[in-house]
Amino acid sequence: RLPPQQIEKSPWSNKYDPPLEDGAMPSARGCWDSIHVVEVQEKSGSGTMNLGGSLTRQMEKDETVSDCSPHIANIGRLVEDMENKIRSTLNEIYFGK
C-alpha cells in the first residue's frame, strides 16, 4: 500500500489513482461539514470561569443545479445562511443575559 502522499483523487472522476478500495467518497447527495472554533484570551483582572458547550444545527434543502447556479454556489449559500442563523442565535444568547 502506498503512503497517502502518493495517492491522488481526481476532482472530475472522483476516483483514486492508484485505485484505493477503502478511500473516502462523498455522498451522492452532497453535504457540508463545518466546525467553527472560538478562541478566548484571558485578560488580567478577569475572574476564573469554565465554559463548555456544543451547538449542532442541521438543514436540508432541495436546490436546482444549472450553469448559472452550480452545486458549489448552492452549498455556499446554504453554509452562509446557516452561519448567519448561528451567529444570530449566539448574539441573542450573549446579549440576552
Swiss-Prot record:
InterPro entries: CapZ_alpha/beta (IPR037282), CapZ_alpha/beta_2 (IPR042276), CAPZB (IPR001698). This is F-actin-capping protein subunit beta. Keywords: Acetylation, Actin capping, Actin-binding, Cytoplasm, Cytoskeleton. It holds the Pfam family F_actin_cap_B. F-actin-capping proteins bind in a Ca(2+)-independent manner to the fast growing ends of actin filaments (barbed end) thereby blocking the exchange of subunits at these ends. Unlike other capping proteins (such as gelsolin and severin), these proteins do not sever actin filaments. Plays a role in the regulation of cell morphology and cytoskeletal organization. Forms, with CAPZB, the barbed end of the fast growing ends of actin filaments in the dynactin complex and stabilizes dynactin structure. Its main location: cytoplasm. Belongs to the F-actin-capping protein beta subunit family.
